[in-house]
Amino acid sequence: MATIAQLIRKPRRHKVKKSKSPALQVNLNTLEKKVTSKSSPFKRGVCTRVGTMTPKKPNSALRKYAKVKLTNGMEVLAYIPGEGHNLQEHSVVLIRGGRVKDLPGVRYHIVRGTLDTTGVDKRRQQRSAYGAKRPKADKKK
C-alpha cells in the first residue's frame, strides 16, 4: 500500500482499456494524409480476398471470411454470416464489430443486405440480422 506522501508525489494511474475492434476507432484524412482517432459503428471497405477457414480445436466447419481493405487504410479479416453469399474480390462491404470466437484473427462481421452484400435467401426468423426482406406470403396480414 502506498503512503499519502507517495501518492501526492505520483498519483495512481488509470488503466488504459484496449479496444476490441481497433479498425473502427481510426479515421483517415485523405487530404492531409493524417490518421485521426474518431470511432464509428461501421466502416466501408473493399474485399481483397474471400475464402474459408477452419475453426479452432473442438469445432469443425468451413467458416466463410473476407479480407477487407477499409477506407481508413487498414486491412482486416471479417466473417460472412448466414448461409450462402455473393461476395467476391472487389465487392464493397460494410463491416461492424464483433469477433468470431473460434476463428483466430477475425474481429469483425460483414453487414448483410447493404452495399454489394445481399441478404440471406429464404430467411424467416431473425431477418434483420441477415438483411432478408419480408416474404411475400406474410405481407397480406
Curated annotation (Swiss-Prot):
Keyword vocabulary terms for this entry: Ribonucleoprotein, Ribosomal protein, RNA-binding, rRNA-binding, tRNA-binding
Domain of life of the native organism: Bacteria
Gene3D superfamilies documented for this protein: Nucleic acid-binding proteins
Xref: InterPro entries: NA-bd_OB-fold, Ribosomal_uS12, Ribosomal_uS12_bac
GO molecular function, one term: structural constituent of ribosome
Annotated stretches, region: Disordered: 118-141
One cellular component (GO) term of this entry: small ribosomal subunit
GO biological process: translation
Keyword rRNA-binding: yes
Family: Belongs to the universal ribosomal protein uS12 family.
Quaternary structure and partners: Part of the 30S ribosomal subunit. Contacts proteins S8 and S17. May interact with IF1 in the 30S initiation complex.
The protein, known as: Small ribosomal subunit protein uS12
Lineage per the UniProt record: Bacteria, Bacillati, Mycoplasmatota, Mycoplasmoidales, Mycoplasmoidaceae
